Amino acid sequence: MVPRLTVILFLTLHLLPGMKSSMVNLINNGYDGIVIAINPSVPEDEKLIQNIKEMVTEASTYLFHATKRRVYFRNVSILIPMTWKSKSEYLMPKQESYDQAEVIVANPYLKHGDDPYTLQYGRCGEKGQYIHFTPNFLLTNNLPIYGSRGRAFVHEWAHLRWGIFDEYNGDQPFYISRRNTIEATRCSTHITGTNVIVKCQGGSCITRPCRRDSQTGLYEAKCTFIPEKSQTARESIMFMQSLHSVTEFCTEKTHNVEAPNLQNKMCNGKSTWDVIMNSTDFQNTSPMTEMNPPTQPTFSLLKSKQRVVCLVLDKSGSMSSEDRLFRMNQAAELFLIQIIEKGSLVGMVTFDSVAEIRNNLTKITDDNVYENITANLPQEANGGTSICRGLKAGFQAIIQSQQSTSGSEIILLTDGEDNEIHSCIEEVKQSGVIIHTIALGPSAAKELETLSDMTGGHRFYANKDINGLTNAFSRISSRSGSITQQTIQLESKALAITEKKWVNGTVPVDSTIGNDTFFVVTWTIKKPEILLQDPKGKKYKTSDFKEDKLNIHSARLRIPGIAETGTWTYSLLNNHASPQILTVTVTTRARSPTTPPVTATAHMSQNTAHYPSPVIVYAQVSQGFLPVLGINVTAIIETEDGHQVTLELWDNGAGADTVKNDGIYSRYFTDYRGNGRYSLKVHAEARNNTARLSLRQPQNKALYIPGYIENGKIILNPPRPEVKDDLAKAEIEDFSRLTSGGSFTVSGAPPGNHPSVLPPNKIIDLEAKFKEDHIQLSWTAPANVLDKGKANSYIIRISKSFLDLQKDFDNATLVNTSSLKPKEAGSDENFEFKPEPFRIENGTNFYIAVQAINEANLTSEVSNIAQAIKFIPMPEDSVPALGTKISAINLAIFALAMILSIV
């Protein structure tokens, strides 16, 4: 038997929280700190707030009983946008913000329906990103479609908080069980119903029983499961929480391990309740003695305020080395001129061993204000490092301007150590301020991340990457949810150019952007000659670029009005007698407040990595809430010593990627080079008209119920709304986006280059089908180490028993794979074999699974289990019109290929 590597080490790491900050705490069985944020584009409506309160109140009781008296909602904040009128009952927010909220209320993009869903793309047990409710869902009666709003909220909360998945499958609504019966994909199998085809015309609908497809053995396309309204089954909330009888999650006893749903695929066939009980929330939480929640939730109404930002910049002696002061000033100038939105209040503090307020808060109204603030950037570096004095001066600059520190932001940049940071931790906690930290160089204080993590701020690290600071400042954009206030970075490139040489480049500007567009060039020795040409041939020269007045070696051009759509071309000439480094940075904003731009965001799966366990790089590329597909996404990770690792990210539903074609691009990272801070940036690029939008409904959502059977009669709900917007286009233009993913910290790694020694990733997309008397298999190739390189060999086993293969893979019949040579990770694998020594007859049912082995003789987890049934299709006119009760259909003579993502 091939030895296996115990994978508990890195699977445990996946259960740690990801990069998104959350202020939610579970204390004495009650959840505190939940934020429900309303998007600024949502019209003011008092009923919306009232319905949110009613939803959460109902959800609290439902959650309490569903978790067997373990948890309930105690304190919830509703964040109201600045676009709404002020009221006396509205309080000032602290660290609460739209971009960090657990729940957002926002309109769908392209009228794509009102299904509540959770953005969730991590592994089993990992928290999701946010829950999305539309105003229409909260304001209209959707009781027949989703059940009550409170129940739908609990369904989504389970996705968000505990990392469990849906127990239905819209793509594969039926499967053939090991008893050779057609079953609806559901949990539990005790939920009863009827299968029908629904046909609607002219406002009326009729139904007929489903027929079996003579080629697959399953029901025909568009066959729909209609549940009985009156049920006795109590499970499961992750299938159909709308049923009155459903009040629990599926347990080990009631779980349907055969169902081809995402819960089985992602959680190795574990029940939802088993995953919930293994969460950190429940490990030290005992059931309460009360039969009902102790209290109803308490709500705080918070109204967003205008943005308040204070720069707290290090000018200690160490900042004079490696051009750090220059680089800091270049990046800070870019932030002040190009990133911070107009109407914001901005202040500046510098510090060494003492601190000085350079600017009290000043409202950004025009270019003169920008110039007045940037004129105070520090020109000399000397003295020691006192971070606490810098922070306290930042608080003072805010308070002296009659503003509250609550909800204000501080951008703290330093390259030095400070042993006294602990002395102001409590003051930082009480201030309510949000601190974004930028560590410059390997000696920056190790406590910086504590400040950003505890206040809900971003964390960044910059070292050898000359654009690292610029990328960090560019990422600190508005947190309000308004698309017009977001700065979008199109280019950030550093170019080492020899003397008297030209370098050329292109930047695509697509039709979703173009407002407030800047081209910025920096240099290390002498200003280069600059040529820039727009898509219509208009040229801009060096004289058009405005040089800064601070001698920080930067020049910028602001494109008047809206930048032309198409490809912009730039050329730079190093006219100095020596080589120098030139940088090009391009930023812009949305073209229209009604059309969301294409955006890219990135983060690591956790803030702290422990060698040799892997971490996952995630990048989300979307337009509004629609995924963008078919593009090249590249991650660049810089280690503490300045070494760069480049990874191509994939959206192929294999390896680190949970779901194919969901706009989430991901990859494992294992190339560790010592301990310390690592930084992440991601470049997303669409060229040659390859990009397209996905108009599919999102994953991880409350099921849209087509109707119910009541007293023997089918009562249909309105059909799910289709995308009807004339602007909905599957194809989108070429574009370029660059974003910083912040930083993460590595521990336990030896010095030098020591990539993790780990097994290949688990295969999760194995498919099988019969071709005459052979079985054809297909899957996505894993790698030598997770998803990097290629595996050494495969183990394929086959059984007639699903449970035997699942529980005792090593003793199932081995398939001869001597002719099978693994391909590079991410490639399509295909293999055909004759299932010997089994006798093959009509109705013979096989289950197959695969393991991959790497060159270190480490084996992957067992793949999902694929099913193949041998059958001879019946003549079309002999196929009976079946489809009444789900449990009554025997398929002994049918065969199909299907994925049962079980293990």
Swiss-Prot record:
Broad EC category: hydrolase
Membrane topology qualifier: Single-pass membrane protein
Residues listed as glycosylation sites in the UniProt record: 360, 372, 504, 842
Main localisation: membrane
EC id: 3.4.-.-
Gene Ontology cellular component terms for the protein in this record: apical plasma membrane; plasma membrane
Organs and tissues of expression: Trachea.
Cross-referenced NCBIfam families: choice_anch_X (NF041940), hCaCC (TIGR00868)
Protein name according to UniProt: Calcium-activated chloride channel regulator 1
Species: Bos taurus
Lineage per the UniProt record: Eukaryota, Metazoa, Chordata, Craniata, Vertebrata
